[in-house]
């Protein structure tokens, strides 16, 4: 039941209706890295390019987006045809050794079939002195999600999918990074409204594709009932920024 795979070419058709780039997340990444005008940056698992484009606009660096899904990259290209896009899995990157100054991935590592091999190949394409930032959620942060309240099976599924932050640091050190560290960040509280409800209705969160139909319908019923009752749902998302330094 929890081994369902996700067809991201199909998901791409609704992805931009329910998911947008996150300036606050990109800002936190930028606070941890120093980039020059000609720095080469790689966004691994860029999806429809939301954060790739935000990162490009916020810096003068040359940012490339990479994703395994052609459908996602098609959407990204529609938004900005100037951003280079590459279709490839994350564990066999089609780049020469020591190409990039900085690599980042946002909410991607739990989608990778072989996260250790992907981190190793990222290490290969990073230049000496470069860094990697993996934005993810710890198991504690997963438990604190609003989706975990209404769809409790999704927390169980995601704690199986997400390597915890100490494990990710281990991936980095095993791959050859000189050091690794993690920094937790709590986003500003937001009141959840129709956008959140529509995201759940459209299964815009990937973990909702991995729970049973019965569990999904029960959770959606409870969520819609909470909105109908006038309950104010306020949520402050927690993320962990795991850094590796080469």
Question: What are the residue ranges of the model-derived segments?
Answer:
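Conserved class I S-adenosyl-L-methionine
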Residues: 1-36, 50-54, 72-75, 131-161
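Class I SAM-dependent methyltransferase SAM/SAH-binding core
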Residues: 40-44, 48-92
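Conserved Class I S-adenosyl-L-methionine
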Residues: 48, 181-246
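A conserved beta-strand element that flanks and buttresses the S-adenosyl-L-methionine
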Residues: 104
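Short catalytic micro-motifs in class I SAM-dependent methyltransferases
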Residues: 107-111
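A short glycine-rich, Lys/Arg-flanked "PGG" loop and its adjoining helix->strand segment in the class I
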Residues: 116-128
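Short alpha-helix
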Residues: 161-175
């Amino acid at each position: 039941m929890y081994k369902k795979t996700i067809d991201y070419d199909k998901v791409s058709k609704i992805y931009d209706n329910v998911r947008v780039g996150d300036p606050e997340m990109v800002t936190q990444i930028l606070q941890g890295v120093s980039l020059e005008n000609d720095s080469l940056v790689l966004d691994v698992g860029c999806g429809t390019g939301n954060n790739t484009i935000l990162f490009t606009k916020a810096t003068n660096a040359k940012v490339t987006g990479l994703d395994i899904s052609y459908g996602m990259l098609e959407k990204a290209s529609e938004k900005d045809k100037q951003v280079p896009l590459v279709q490839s899995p994350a564990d066999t990157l089609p780049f020469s050794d020591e190409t990039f100054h900085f690599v980042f991935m946002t909410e991607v590592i739990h989608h990778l079939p072989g996260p250790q091999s992907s981190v190793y190949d990222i290490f290969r394409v990073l230049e000496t002195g470069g860094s990697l930032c993996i934005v993810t959620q710890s198991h504690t942060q997963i438990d604190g999600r609003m989706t975990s309240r209404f769809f409790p099976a999704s927390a169980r599924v995601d704690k199986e999918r997400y390597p915890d932050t100490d494990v990710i640091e281990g991936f980095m050190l095993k791959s050859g990074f000189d050091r690794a560290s993690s920094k937790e960040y709590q986003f500003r509280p937001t009141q959840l409204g129709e956008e959140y409800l529509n995201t759940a209705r459209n299964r815009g969160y990937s973990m909702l594709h991995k729970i049973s139909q019965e569990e999904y319908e029960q959770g959606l019923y409870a969520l819609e009932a909470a909105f109908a009752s006038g309950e104010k749902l306020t949520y402050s998302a927690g993320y962990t920024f795991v850094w590796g330094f080469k």
